[in-house]
Amino acid sequence: MYRWEEKLSLKGLPLGIPLLLNGAVLTKGPVGIILPLFVFGVYLLMLRKYSLLRIFKTLLYTGVSSLFIPMLWYIEAWKQGGNDFLNVVLAENFGRFFHLSEANISYDLGHKEGFWYNFVTLAAGFMPWTLLLFFSLFGVSWRKPQGSFGRWVRNAWNTILSLDKIRLFSLVASVCIVFFYMLPSSKRSVYLMPAYPFIALFMSQAILYLTEHRSKLTRVFAGVLTAVASVAFVTALLSMTGTVDLAALASQYTSGVSVLQTIEAVGQAFHPSVSTIIVLVLLLTALLISYYQLFKKINIKMLYASIFLIFCVHLFIDGIVMRGIRNENSSRAFAREIRGAYPLNKDNVFVMNNLRQYTNLYGLNFYLGNCFHNFETEQPQTGYFLADERDYPKVLERYAGVYTFEELRTSGRILADVKARVVLSRFARK
């Protein structure tokens, strides 16, 4: 859309725009078209190049042309799902945004956070560069604005309007996306992903400036980063060779079951494998380059070395540490265990489906092939029942006079998606 305005001055309508927006609506719902048009509309207004009527017609034609394929899908889905489907669509897409009642759906929308959540999420998402920019603020020479506050605001506004198109569009996109997702009650870190590339443009320019004009700060940052990465590399190496047992070491300082399970999972992830060795070799290479550049005086190369090191650290965290944690705490292993031990099929597995009162076992449902049935509504004669360890006693108490439950298996670990152990039982109507 930016190229459409820059190259064609809004003449015609490139086929790629409605096709991409069609795909956005099908994957993310109405926000897939509302948010891009909101950003583009504000950008066109700030260009002060087109009339309000021209901007309105541009957004209208773009929006209408992007609804044909999604409307066909929504109509067919509504024919199959009826009002239940419509209620979920309205709740998920408009109930979240407008803080509407959730009475027409059987679960809480959740993810309710304060307005500050988005800013904390962005700061965490850009780590460790956020730390570099934060500490750079202490060396800034703050000057009192000249003239009245109104004059200062006008000068700031004129400065923004005088930005080149790429920077102006990036600024508009960053502010509009963050502002847009401050409005709904539901807030999640993934909602802000569209803003990251645009914010990164300004962050990269700030980091380049610091590298050229405040090289000491950049080198201190690189040194601290290299030291922390070195500790992580040595820890992984000691665990891999069996020199250090991370779980045994941690047990001397904490007795928390979930903490010890997590540390044990990380230790298991450090066991030798092709992917683990490749990541550690890359991390070692990045460390050697960083140590070498720390003793050189070419600042830009030091920055490049830091970028490569941060990339390898992310590989280390996501490719080894988090992979181990997710594999150990995933519902997949327990699903495989109970499916192999008991004759579970698409007709005999039941759960409590009132998600306002009971935990959603969505992970197990996925790994068992989406075979769950609603125990409350179907009231079956016999079958298998799944619930987490917090809900299971409530179910036993509620149906004590109607069903008998025989506990068969409990997950050995706390499953990440439900934050509790899950119990499998066999039931029969009395």
Regions found by a protein language model. Give the residues of each.
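A generic structural signal for nonpolar/aromatic side chains embedded in well-ordered alpha-helices
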Residues: 1, 88-89, 97, 207, ...
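Specific aromatic-rich, kink-prone transmembrane helix
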Residues: 1-6, 41, 199-202
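Membrane-interface transmembrane helices that cradle and orient dolichyl/undecaprenyl
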Residues: 1-14, 207
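Transmembrane-lumen/periplasm boundary regions of multi-pass, lipid-linked membrane glycan transferases
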Residues: 4, 19-20, 27, 32-185, ...
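Juxtamembrane helix-boundary/capping and inter-helix hinge elements in multi-pass membrane proteins
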Residues: 8, 82, 212-213
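Membrane-embedded alpha-helical bundles of multi-pass enzymes
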Residues: 14, 18, 34-37, 191-198
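Membrane-embedded architecture of ER/inner-membrane glycosylation machinery
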Residues: 142, 146-430
